[in-house]
């Protein structure tokens, strides 16, 4: 009722190309079941905080998957589905994960352990910061999101299994989708 800050949690950004006036584009996600808050920072670090702002765990997607957020810290908002907190990032790694891609990464919301890594799209042209959306369409629960390859992709949020993709643009999709019944509405400009 007062507008006063209840708590604040600050953490370091270890990427030198992120200017201080553009420090990430994602909103945190609050979990109504646990009261916890999840954030994906400009350095591609996922942080879990209790409802009173105490750190529970953190995971560096930037270090583990070579995720990059580019100038300005373009990151997607995390989304919660059941026991998962799901994030996404453009990556370019070594070995079996060397191919540049835009991966969707699901973590156990209580422990931060990786549950799955999904790669539903093609090679990204840009990083993307579209908000993911979860909807049930024709009886199937889907996570639908625009990625850096210019496509809108639908996966099963509990398994990461790709259901469908639609290439909508030549560059990243940076707007969230709207779902009405069984219709997915996208915009890009």
Enumerate the predicted regions with their spans.
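Noncatalytic, solvent-exposed loop/strand surfaces
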Residues: 1-189
């Amino acid at each position: 009722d007062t507008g006063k800050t209840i708590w604040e949690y600050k953490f370091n950004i270890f990427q030198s190309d992120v200017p201080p006036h553009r420090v990430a584009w994602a909103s945190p996600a609050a979990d109504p079941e646990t009261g916890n808050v999840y954030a994906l920072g400009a350095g591609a670090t996922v942080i879990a905080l209790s409802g009173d702002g105490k750190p529970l765990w953190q995971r560096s997607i930037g270090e583990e998957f070579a995720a990059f957020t580019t100038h300005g810290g373009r990151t997607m908002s995390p989304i919660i589905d059941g026991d998962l907190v799901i994030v996404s990032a453009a990556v370019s790694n070594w070995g079996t994960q060397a191919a540049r891609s835009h991966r969707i990464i699901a973590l156990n919301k209580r422990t931060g352990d990786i549950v799955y890594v999904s790669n539903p799209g093609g090679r990204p042209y840009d990083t993307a910061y579209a908000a993911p959306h979860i909807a049930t369409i024709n009886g199937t629960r889907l996570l639908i999101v625009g990625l850096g390859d210019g496509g809108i992709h639908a996966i099963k949020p509990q398994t990461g299994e790709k259901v469908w993709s639609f290439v909508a643009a030549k560059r990243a999709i940076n707007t969230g989708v709207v779902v009405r019944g069984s219709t997915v509405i996208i915009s890009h400009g």
